[in-house]
Amino acid sequence: GVRTAVKDSIGSVTPTSTTTFTNKRITARVDSTTSSATPSINTDNVDTYKLTAQALDITSFTTNLTGTPTDDQILHIVIIGTGARAITWGSSFEASTVALPTTTVSTDRLDVYFIFNTATSKWRCGGVW
């Protein structure tokens, strides 16, 4: 994904330059929906996607997934349910040594981190909290 240009005493940083950032923060691009069985996520526009007050089983994260991910791009998905909800990831996601979660637990927050794997063209699960 493309990060927003940063301005400071050294001037602007463009997406094609090589620059070392020291004491700088890169703010994640965040989008959210209150509840959806097929969430709409455009990976060109978000780093973190939040489902809040999830009141439905998630039947597919793949159905409305759009964007052109880059090698090793990171996607963070947050699900906060109103109860235990089933999760179906779909064909755009894969497990690694970390399994894809298949359900939320009550109203607990579920954080799932993915890294785009260009070898398989899938979002590979890298961590679950």
Which residues make up each language-model segment?
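Short proline/glycine- and polar residue-rich coil/turn motifs
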Residues: 102-107
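Exposed extracellular interaction/assembly regions and N-terminal maturation sites
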Residues: 22-93, 108-109, 116-129
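A diffuse structural propensity rather than consistent per-protein peaks
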Residues: 6, 14, 40-42
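Tryptophan-centered short beta-strand motifs
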Residues: 1-5, 121-123
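Extracellular beta-sheet repeat scaffolds used for adhesion and glycan interaction
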Residues: 92-101
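Generic signature of intrinsically disordered, low-complexity, basic-rich segments
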Residues: 1, 16, 30-34
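Register-specific beta-strand positions within repetitive beta-rich fiber domains
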Residues: 8-27
